[in-house]
Every structure is written in C-alpha cells, then in structure tokens.
C-alpha cells in the first residue's frame, strides 16, 4: 500500500459549501428584510455573493487580506451590487452568517460511505483546511464528519495557508506522516493541487464541477465514489 495517510480538504470537497451557503443566505435575506431594502430578487443576490466570496477567498489565500476582512467584505461587496453602501449592515450580516452557516450539514454524495470505506481499509484520514478554526470544527461536528479524522490542520493553527509549503510540512509533522506515503485530496487547483505539488506531495483533484486544467495531478475524479478505484 503506497499511501498510508490521506489529507482531505473540507469545503467544496466533502462539505458542500455552495449548497449550505445558499440555505444560510436565504435565512439572512429574510432575517434582514433585504428585499425591502431593494436587494431583489434573491436569485440575483446569491450569485453576486458567490462571485465576491470566490474573489475574496483567492485574495485571502494569497495573503492580501485578513480572515476578518474576508468575512464582512463579501457581504459589503454584494450589497454594493444593489447600491447599498452600509458597512454596519454588512458586518451584522457577516456575524449572523458565521453563526448559522456551520450548523448546515449538506455533504457531497457518498461522503460518509467513502470515509467508512477508507477507514475500514486502515488509512489515516486527516484534514487540511484554510477555513476558520471555530467554524470548521462546528461544520465537522454538525455534519457528523469529526469522528473520521485523526488530525484537523487549520490555517489558523498552523499559521500558514494552502498553497504555502509550510502548512503541508506542519500537517506531516502533526500526523507523523511523510510526503512519500501521503496524498492530498481537494477541489481547489491553487490551494490544494498546486500546493501539494509544490510541497512534493501526490494529489487527487476532486473535480465536482468538471473544471478544465493544464495541471497534471496524480489523479482526477469527478465523484467521491471513484476513490474506491484508487484505494
């Protein structure tokens, strides 16, 4: 068995961030009466949020903004799309979002089944996530994922972000693993795939949405059940 340790990303890989965020944002839309403020319809509000969230996460990954800026500025920029320049409202929406998002528990299809399968085969299962420490732990507990992982490495605990090599080195040390017997599984081409490749680690691109890329990960899958063909 070449691999002994499997390091998973969480958001967009196992935990369905977009689906869970949509539910949470629907609640925010209603709670803050955004329709009455001119933020309408929700069908426009939601894609604007996803757009700005992606941009700001990318900036956060590169160290251009802080986690706190990411949290409220994604709301702020979304409101600006509707000509609402209300920083106080954006920060209140952000705080409420961070409170309700982690209790959502939608996972990608067959997440639990594949984790059961891998655990049964005695692989060491771990997480490497750029998500916020408290939030990620809540997501894991509320979705029933926490018992599967021996080590949960967050950017806050390691003081480093994927794709930086330091977070992968920290993960190896924490798990007592070696790059040669470990593999990274994730959806983000920059953070997970480039990060692992630059660290000298094999990787699996979990390509749920069929993104094209010139990168050459060790494996590419479009569905978690395909891991049964690898391990």
Predicted feature descriptions by range:
Residues 70-74, 106, 113, 166, ...:
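Generic recognition of short, well-ordered alpha-helical interface segments
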Residues 33, 38-40, 82, 111-112, ...:
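Short, intrinsically disordered/low-complexity patches at protein termini
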Residues 2-108:
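N-terminal helical cap/lid subdomain that shapes the substrate entry/recognition surface
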Residues 1-6, 19, 116-119, 128, ...:
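Asp-based, Mg2+/Mn2+-dependent phosphohydrolase catalytic module
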Residues 110-122:
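Catalytic-core regions built around general acid/base machinery
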């Amino acid at each position: 068995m070449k691999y002994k340790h499997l390091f998973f990303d969480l958001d967009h890989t196992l935990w369905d961030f977009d689906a869970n965020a949509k539910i949470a944002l629907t609640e925010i839309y209603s709670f803050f009466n955004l329709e009455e403020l001119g933020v309408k319809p929700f069908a426009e509000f939601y894609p604007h949020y996803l757009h700005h969230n992606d941009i700001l996460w990318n900036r956060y990954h590169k160290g251009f903004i802080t986690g706190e800026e990411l949290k409220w500025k994604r709301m702020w920029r979304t409101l600006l799309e509707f000509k609402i320049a209300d920083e106080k409202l954006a920060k209140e929406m952000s705080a409420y979002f961070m409170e309700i998002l982690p209790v959502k528990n939608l996972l990608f299809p067959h997440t639990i089944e594949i984790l059961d399968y891998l655990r049964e085969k005695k692989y060491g299962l771990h997480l490497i996530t750029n998500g916020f420490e408290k939030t990620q732990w809540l997501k894991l507990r509320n979705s029933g994922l926490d018992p599967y992982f021996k080590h949960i490495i967050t950017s806050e605990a390691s003081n480093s972000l994927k794709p930086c090599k330091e977070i992968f080195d920290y993960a190896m040390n924490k798990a007592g693993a070696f790059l040669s017997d470990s593999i990274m599984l994730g959806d983000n081409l920059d953070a997970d795939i480039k990060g692992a490749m630059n660290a000298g680690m094999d990787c699996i691109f979990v390509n749920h949405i069929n993104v094209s890329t010139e990168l050459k990960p060790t494996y590419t899958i479009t569905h978690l059940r395909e891991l049964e063909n690898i391990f």
